[in-house]
Amino acid sequence: MRQYYYQDCALLQGDVDAVCQSIYDNRADFSYATPELNVGGTNAAPSGVYQDGDPPTTGKEYIYEIENDPETEGYNTWSVTYNV
């Protein structure tokens, strides 16, 4: 999967967090070189602070992890669009 567009679905914050966590939990299974996630638009902002959480527990920490691979696990990093 290359692009996961889930914007403008009026998702609640917990739902946005769940989408981000699901991608984080399965990060090693995505083989496309430049995957994209869009959970912006009419959706709520993900919870938390955009930072390296070890382990991540909030939506923005999951986003940080999949965008940066701070533990250098070697998975393909994502481009993520979300509401702040």
What is each stretch, according to the model?
Residues 2-3, 7-84:
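N-terminal capping/linker segments that flank leucine-rich repeat
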